[in-house]
Amino acid sequence: MHRSLAIFAGLILTGIGLSLSPSATPRAAETPSEIKGAFRLPEKNGWTFVHLQGTPHEIGFQNGYLLAPEIADTLKVVQLEATHDSKKEWAFFRDAAQNMMWPHIEQEYRDELQGISDGATAHGVKIDLWDVVALNAAEEWSYYVKYYDKQHRIQTASLGVPEHCSAFVATGSYTKDGKAVIAHNNWTGYLDGERWTIIYDITPARGKRMLMDGLPGVIHSADDFVTNSAGITITEATIGHFSGYDPAAIPEFVRARKAAQYSASIDDFARIMKDGNNGGYANTWLIADINRNEIGRLELGLTNVTLEKKTDGYFVGSNFPINESLIKEELTSIPRI
C-alpha cells in the first residue's frame, strides 16, 4: 500500500474560537426528527464540514444519516486494510468489537455509536453496530492483533512501510506573539487518507463543543487534531515500534473522544487518557491550553506514562518516545531518528 499522502493541519491559536454560524438550513421536514439542527456543507477544497448537536444518540444518528454513503465507503477501506495487514477475517474484528471492547465503553458513547448505525440505516445504508465500533477502533487494531497473536503463539504479519507523522507545540518566547502555536503533519495511506476529510463541529448536550477532523462515522478524530470550546487543543504523534495492550481496559478511541469533550485543562486531558488506558494507539500527545497559555506533552505508554508542562518552550513528537523506561520496556526495537 502506498503511504505517502501528506495531510498538514496547523492552527495559530491566538483568538481562536468555535463561534461558527451555519449558512445552510436543516434538511426537509420529512427527514427524521433527530436531524434537527444538524447539517453538512458542500465539499470545499476537499473538506466536508458537518455540524452535529444534541444527545449522544442524536449526535450519532446525525453522523450516520448525513454521511451514510461515505461511511459505507470508508468501512470497505478499513475492512480491506485490517484484513490485509493482519491476515485475519473481518469477523475477527467484529467479534473483538462486541466481546472485548463493548463491555468497556460507557453508556454515553454506546448511545452515540448505536446512533451512527441507526442514522445510516435510516438513510438506506445498512451498517451494523459492530461494524461501527470496529471502524472507530481502526487505529488500535494493530496493537490488539500483536497482543492476540502473542497470546496464541502466532507470527504477526509485518507491514513493509509504516505510517508516519510529526507535530510540535510551542508558546512564550518560542512564538512570534508569545501565544501558543500547534501543528501536525501526517503521512497516511492513500486509501484512508483520501477519505479522512470530514471536519466535525460537535455541540454535545454535555461537555465542550469540539472542532476536529476525522473519517466518516467516527466519534473521535484519530488523526488527531482537535480543539474544544475550553481552549484545549490536541494533537499527537504515534509511538513507533510500541508493543503492549490490555484487552480489559477502555479503548483508545473512547478515551480520546472523552478527553476532547470534557477537558478544561492539560491535567484534565492527561487524567482522562490515563484512566483505563488499554495501550491501544500509543501516542505522544501534545496539548495547548490557550486560556492559560500553557503547553504539555503526555507520553502515554501502557505502563510508562510521562506528563510535562511548560508556559515557555516547546514540545515535539515524531514517532519516537523520550522516556527511557518506555523505550527499554515497551518497544520491540529502537526507532531510527
Stretch-by-stretch model annotation:
Residues M1-A9:
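Bacterial N-terminal signal peptides that target proteins for export
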Residues F8-S21:
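Bacterial N-terminal signal peptides
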Residues L20-D267, I272-G280, W285-T311, G317-S318, ...:
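N-terminal mature-domain region immediately after signal-peptide cleavage
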